[in-house]
Amino acid sequence: MCIRDRVLVIDGQGGGLGRQLVSALAAACPEAELTAVGTNSLAANAMLKAGASRAATGENAVVVNCRRADVIVGPIGIVIADALLGEITPAMAAAVCQSGAKRVLVPINHCENYVVGVPDQPISQLVAAAAQKVKELCSAIG
């Protein structure tokens, strides 16, 4: 069970993946403190409506919340500067990479970044797998 684990979901653009992740994580780890940070307000609002405990927007919110998180979840682009059509700044990518948190990255092949060796799967399967991994990590942490 995810008791008091701090799970941070980061997404950008329209927040569609983040919304799905938040919804799945809220079901898988109902006791987790689920924070959503969007690179823009549209993404943040989508994740908040999906069940995040709280949401914030922007570079500083990513940096601050990465320091506080036990687990960070999002598309693989959150560790690549200039990914998500330029929404991920170098400071955001560095904050995710340098965080002491465990990272669960969803392999989305978009924006000129490709993950080889991972078969293409529907987003719903990737989201379910990510939620399961976070649940396992939360059980190990808690």
Place the predicted regions along the sequence by residue.
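N-terminal beta-loop-helix "entrance" segment that forms/cooperates
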Residues: T35-T57, N113-V116
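A short helix->loop->beta-strand "cap" motif at the edges of active sites that frequently abuts
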Residues: E31-A32, Q98-R103
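Conserved small/polar residues in nucleotide/adenosyl-binding loops
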Residues: M1-D5
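Glycine-rich phosphate/diphosphate-binding loop of Rossmann-like nucleotide-binding domains
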Residues: R6-S41
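Glycine-rich phosphate-binding loop
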Residues: R54-M92
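Short, well-ordered alpha-helices that flank and scaffold nucleotide-derived cofactor binding pockets
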Residues: R19, S23, A27, K49, ...
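Short, glycine-/small-residue-rich phosphate/pyrophosphate-handling segment
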Residues: L105-G142
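Fold-independent oxyanion-binding glycine-rich loops
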Residues: I10-Q13, V37-N40, G58-N60, P75-G77, ...
